[in-house]
Each structure stands twice: as structure tokens, then as C-alpha cells.
Amino acid sequence: MTFDAFTKVVAQADARGEFLSDAQLDALSRLVAEGNKRIDTVNRITGNASSIVANAARALFAEQPSLIAPGGNAYTNRRMAACLRDMEIILRYVTYAVFTGDASILDDRCLNGLRETYLALGVPGASVAEGVRKMKDAAVAIVSDRNGITQGDCSAIISELGSYFDKAAAAVA
């Protein structure tokens, strides 16, 4: 079962039979203060998801044209659609992780066993990882645009966002 940050803190305090500590409350207060930034981040990525995936795939196939050549892993419309679907699923779970501030949903529901599945299907993990890195670059650029977003230092959330993409790329490579 996946727990959010609040549930984890309460479960830890309850297991010890203690009230929440000042340090725990301060940490949760900071998380709440960052909540609007998380929502803005997820909204921006979600609103641009189609272009993030399409542009990452386009750039990947431009760099690795053998993927879309006859016999390539993304050759035929069915395989191309599966590739785009998988990229979109990874992006979606990255947004869930950013929203909750917890990578476990990404690990448990998306990445767990993905490398093995790709190996069994003959999908080149290095190419998938490169596609994920291209989505990371696009998502970070979109989130880093300071126009129309909650003001303040967003470097921590941007770093966190990047770490989820890095985790996904490493999981499939």
C-alpha cells in the first residue's frame, strides 16, 4: 500500500505512541507551502503532455532512425502507438510522483518489472531511456518557465521532477 507524506508521518508517530513532533509538523507545513507549486507543476506537464511525448519521440526517432525503419522496434503504426503509449504512461506516473512528493507510486505501478518486460519483448531499453530523458528535458523547460506559476523558488521541485525522470530512465536502461 502506498502512503502519502502525511499518512507516513502519522503512521510513524502512531507506531511509537507519540504525538507529532515539532520537526514533523514543520516538515509537513513546508510540504503544504509547496503544494501550490506542485499543483502548478503537474498542471503544466499535464497540459503539455501530448507535445512532451510527441516531441520527445520525434527527437528520439530523428537520432535513432533505425527504430522506425522496417524491422525497427517502432516500425508499423501498432508498434509506434505502443511506444507513444508507454512514454505517456511514464510521464503520467512522473506527475503522480510529483503531486504526492513520493516516488513509490512510480516504482510500484509503473517501473516495477518494466525492464524485464522490455527485455522479453526485445525493446531496446537504452532507446526508451533516451526517450525518457528527452521528456525530462521538455518537462523541466516547461516547468521552469516562471510566467503564470506560483512565485517563489521552484528549484527543489524542478530537481525532484528531474529525479523521477532519472529514476524512470535508469529503470528501463
Swiss-Prot record:
InterPro entries per record: Globin-like_sf, Phycobilisome_asu/bsu, Phycobilisome_asu/bsu_sf, Phycocyanin_b
Pfam families: Phycobilisome
The UniProt record lists the keyword Metal-binding: no
Entry GO CC: phycobilisome; plasma membrane-derived thylakoid membrane
Signal peptide feature range: none
List of residues binding (2R,3E)-phycocyanobilin 2: 154
The keyword Acetylation is assigned to this record: no
Subunit structure: Heterodimer of an alpha and a beta subunit, which further assembles into trimers and the trimers into hexamers.
Full protein name: C-phycocyanin beta subunit
Gene transcribed to yield this protein: cpcB1
